[in-house]
A protein has these predicted regions:
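The feature captures the beta-strand-to-loop junction immediately N-terminal to the Walker
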Residues: 36-38
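A short, proline-enriched helix->beta-strand linker immediately N-terminal to the Walker B motif
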Residues: 153-157
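Conserved ABC ATPase signature
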Residues: 134-138, 142
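Helix-to-loop junction immediately C-terminal to a conserved catalytic motif
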Residues: 51
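Conserved ABC transporter NBD signature motif
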Residues: 59-67, 79, 218
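Conserved ABC ATPase "signature" region
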Residues: 114-129
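ABC ATPase NBD coupling module
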Residues: 68-84, 110
Length: 219
């Protein structure tokens, strides 16, 4: 099994407080890794470091053999073809002036076929009629499914879910967990599933990393 992500000597501080301090973390292709810890322990900061939206002080983020930690926005656009992220608040991640279908079509860039957009929606359990709905017209669970469709549009090898189900009720949460698990297995994606809920992580992940005070204390 090949390594898809390797973090080495990662350090990030805000003022005098160390937010992330990780010696090493390796994620292999095809794994579903849970990252768990209490709120404020540094999980979302680490996700930002991996996606290069949060700049680290020192260390390296090796993704598919390249250190992307110093990449500029242009270079990161190429990386985002293989790496996507789903956020805690799906509605906030969509442009309210765009239909859900248009947002997904934008992710497709050069292949904005209406049929392909509809197929993506159907693949995440949404009927084609949702293509023409706006974020404010659908439930949180439906919007999160659309967010997953948008992430899948570029056929990523690596998917980060940052508290992607925490704002949903238990029933919808279970449906989204089952969907992510099914897609991870069928598409052979690598998933980093970030959550404060260890029981939830155990349902979907084959490996678990425990974070406390910015450090990985168990993996």
């Amino acid at each position: 099994m090949s390594t898809i992500l390797e973090l080495n000597n990662i350090k990030k501080a805000y003022d005098v407080k160390m937010a992330v301090d990780i010696d090493k973390l390796v994620i292999e292709e095809g794994d579903c890794v849970g990252l768990v810890g209490e709120s404020g322990c540094g999980k979302s900061t680490l996700a930002g470091i991996i996606t290069n939206t949060v700049k680290l002080y020192s260390g390296s983020v090796i993704f598919k053999g390249e250190d992307i930690s110093r990449f500029n926005a242009r270079k990161m656009r190429d990386i985002y073809k293989n790496m996507q992220m789903i956020y805690q608040s799906p509605v906030a991640s969509f442009d309210p002036e765009y239909t859900l279908g248009k947002s997904v079509a934008e992710a497709l860039r050069n292949n904005k076929s209406d049929n392909l957009v509809s197929e993506l929606f159907i693949s995440v359990g949404l009927s084609a009629e949702y293509v023409n709905k706006y974020p404010g017209q659908v439930s949180g669970g439906e919007c999160q499914r659309a967010a997953i469709a948008r992430a899948l549009a570029v056929k990523p090898e690596f998917l980060i879910c940052d508290e992607a189900t925490s704002a949903l009720d238990v029933t919808v949460q279970s449906q989204i967990i089952a969907l992510i698990k099914q897609l991870q297995q069928s598409r052979k994606m690598t998933v980093l599933f970030i959550s404060h809920d260890i029981a939830l992580v155990s349902q979907i992940c084959n490996k678990t990393a425990v974070m406390k005070d910015g450090k990985i204390i168990e993996y």
